[in-house]
Swiss-Prot record:
Endpoints of the signal sequence: 1-19
Protein name: Probable pectate lyase C
Necessary cofactors: Ca(2+)
Cofactor note: Binds 1 Ca(2+) ion per subunit.
Keyword Cell wall biogenesis/degradation applies: yes
Keywords noted in UniProt: Calcium, Carbohydrate metabolism, Cell wall biogenesis/degradation, Glycoprotein, Lyase, Metal-binding, Polysaccharide degradation, Secreted, Signal
GO BP annotations, alphabetical order: cell wall organization; polysaccharide catabolic process
Disulfide bonds: none
InterPro entries: EF_Hand_1_Ca_BS, Pectin_lyas_fold, Pectin_lyase_fold/virulence, Polysaccharide_Lyase_1
Glycosylation sites: 48, 164, 201, 282
Biased composition (Acidic residues): 373-386
Amino acid sequence: MRLTPSLISCLSLLHFTSALVAFPGAEGFGANAVGGRQGEVYVVSNLNDSGEGSLRDAVSQPGRIVVFSVGGVIEITDRIVVSKQVTILGQTAPGDGITVYGNGWSFSNADDAIVRYIRIRMGKGGSSGKDAMGIADGKNMIFDHVSVSWGRDETFSINGDVSNVTIQNSIIAQGLETHSCGGLMQTDGGVSLFRNLYIDNKTRNPKVKGVNEFTNNVIYNWGGGGGYIAGGSDGESNVNVIGNYFISGPDTSVTAFTRGNENFHAYVETNYYDSDKDGTLNGSELGVDSTNYGGMDLVTEKYDYPAVASVLSPDDALTYVTKYAGASKVRDSVDTQLVAQVESYGKDGALISDEADMGGAGDLDQGTTPTDTDGDGIPDDAEAELGTDPNTADSMDLDTSGYTFLEVWANSLVPSSYA
């Protein structure tokens, strides 16, 4: 279902959108993504792979805010390609939310994407040599509380002419063997990685080149390919690495940081490493010495990149990530197992070649489709609370905050901060 917004002056709209972050709690290089705020609403009303009311159809055209009137697993055959200026609000799905299973997604050239609270699980049946999520060009994107797993090449990768991207509060897990990679983060345009969990990837947790802010992440059970891999190339990289926790798992056989050189310039601060796999969390701070950071060129001043509002200690980052990372409005069976692995502190975890080892995508409660008399994406009971008219399609009108009423409702469904 598609509706155009009520008439609003372009000047007013541009004023509001330029001053807003993507949603309350958006941080980093991608914080000012606009998404579909200047477009129309599309309600995903079924779990079909394609056709009217499907998620694939929803993201196929630019300028849309996508909400859900159904929860469950969407099984796809071909990759989903996302258009420009699309907002995907998975937290609006009833029941246990949305999982997309069977192949990967491309966000290449999907400028101003906003993606929240959704699970993207590729699997061994997906396209060979492709990422579960990939960006090969584009700008101004933010991914928040996304669970991505089972990529056949990388799990979540960013390459090429890409600028201003944030991945925050997310889980990047279990790239499938024999490749098993967390992802490449290789652009000079700026990537922020905040409060994410990298888990059960043999290598590239992540592999970084260019401009990167890496703060309050948890990295668990990387394999012999490496944890945080510096570029290892002639190109210049300039990064901040702050407040992260690296925890060795059963498959870990190399140190947390590898492949740095004189061209990889890093400001590092308060990063912890628990290497003993003894089932007890007892990591200690890595000394600020190049040998502890894989031969990086360590600098003394932090790069002036868009930072998190509040930097957590590594211990607090671990607590936060295990409680809230991923599509955590309702944790599914896969993410629940992954978090349990982390909390074994070295005893549990595995590199896998088949998602069947995790029970596959699992089953989700589809929930109950809410009553939405005017079909504008906001349920009637929520319209009463917002003060909007349940008989008039006004969800894309602007609230005094500058967000559409649709965004105001969706933002109210989840915390802006989990502090």
